[in-house]
Design a protein with these regions (language model features):
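C-terminal leucine-rich, beta-strand-based interaction scaffolds used for sensing/assembly
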Residues: 95-273
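The catalytic "switch" region of P-loop NTPases
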Residues: 1-92
Length: 273
C-alpha cells in the first residue's frame, strides 16, 4: 500500500503518509511470507523483551522501559533506578522473598502491557487505602492478586477467541479448574484427563490429552520444570529461528514436571494445593 497507493498521492510535499504494521512475532512468522526472518532483521523494528537470567533484570530492555516510565514522571529524572523509589522492597511468596521486579516478572509473560496493568492495579489499591506509594502488603494482598489473575484470564480468553467460541473456551477453563494442582507430573495430568467429566467433548474440540497439554504450554499457562530449577516457558524459548518451539511428546515421561503460571492461581483455583 505504501508503494502502490500512498506514493501516488499528490501534494506529498505537505507530508508523507505511511502505514506501519504492528504485530506479534508468532503471527508475523506464521503469515506465510518468504524469508520472514530476514524481513524482521532488515526491515523491521523488532521489540524483544526476552531475557536469560532474572538476576540480571536491571540490564534488560524491559526493566529499562518500565524504569523510564517512572523517570519520565519524576521531578529529578535521574539515571538512578526510579523503580526502587516506588517498589524498593521485597515481596513474600510462601517462604521466599523476591525482589519486587522479579516478582512482577513472574506474574507476567514479560510484556510491557502486563506491567502497565500491574502498576494500574497497584495505583488503584493505593488510592483505596489513601496512601501515596505501594507496599509489599498491597502486592501480596488477595485483592491485588485476584485483580491481576482476572486480567490474565481475560487476556487468555481473548487470545483463544481467535480459534474457539465462548462455550469451547469455557470448557477448557473448566478442565483447568478441574486439575486443582499448581504443580503436577505428566502422570497426574493423564489421571485428571481420564476422570474429567467432559473428556469426550474436550477431546472432540481440542484433541487428545497431549494436544491439550501442548495448548496450555503454547499459551503460556504451564511450563516444563527441568532439574527442579529451570522453568521452560514458551514465551522465553520462542525466537525468530525457533518460533514454532513447543512440547515434544517423545521427551515426556510419567515423571515430567509441570507448573502453572503464577497469574492463573486465583482465577482457576490452583492456589488451593
Amino acid at each position: 500500500m505504501n508503494s502502490d497507493l500512498l506514493s501516488r498521492i499528490k501534494d506529498r510535499n505537505k507530508g508523507r503518509l505511511q502505514i506501519v504494521l504492528l504485530t506479534r512475532l508468532d503471527i508475523f512468522l506464521n503469515a506465510g511470507l518468504s524469508n520472514a526472518g530476514s524481513k524482521i532483521s532488515d526491515n523491521s523494528a523488532f521489540l524483544n523483551w526476552s531475557f536469560i537470567s532474572e538476576k540480571d533484570y536491571p540490564k534488560t530492555d524491559l526493566f529499562l522501559l518500565v524504569n523510564n516510565m517512572f523517570n519520565s514522571a519524576s521531578k529529578d529524572n535521574k539515571e538512578q533506578s526510579a523503580w526502587d523509589n516506588y517498589f524498593g522492597f521485597k515481596i513474600k511468596r510462601g517462604q521466599k522473598d523476591f525482589d519486587s521486579f522479579v516478582y512482577f516478572l513472574r506474574l507476567t509473560t514479560s510484556k510491557p502491557r502486563d506491567f502497565v496493568k500491574l502498576l494500574k492495579i497497584a495505583k488503584e489499591q493505593c488510592q483505596a487505602d489513601y496512601i501515596e506509594n505501594p507496599t509489599a502488603e498491597i502486592i501480596e494482598s488477595d485483592l491485588f492478586q485476584r485483580a491481576y489473575s482476572t486480567y490474565f484470564a481475560e487476556s487468555l480468553r481473548t487470545a483463544l477467541g481467535f480459534y474457539y467460541d465462548r462455550e469451547q473456551i469455557k470448557l477448557l477453563f473448566d478442565f483447568i479448574k478441574f486439575i486443582k494442582l499448581r504443580r503436577f507430573t505428566y502422570q497426574q495430568y493423564q489421571n485428571v484427563w481420564i476422570n474429567f467429566y467432559e473428556k469426550n467433548a474436550l477431546e472432540e474440540i481440542f484433541g487428545n490429552e497431549f494436544e491439550v497439554l501442548e495448548l496450555l504450554f503454547n499459551f503460556n499457562l504451564v511450563a516444563v520444570i527441568e532439574d527442579d530449577s529451570y522453568y521452560r516457558w514458551k514465551y522465553r524459548e520462542c525466537t525468530i529461528a525457533n518460533y514454532d518451539y513447543s512440547l515434544q511428546k517423545n521427551d515426556l515421561t510419567p515423571d515430567t514436571k509441570f507448573v502453572f503460571h503464577w497469574a492463573t492461581e486465583k482465577e482457576f483455583g490452583l492456589y488451593l494445593k
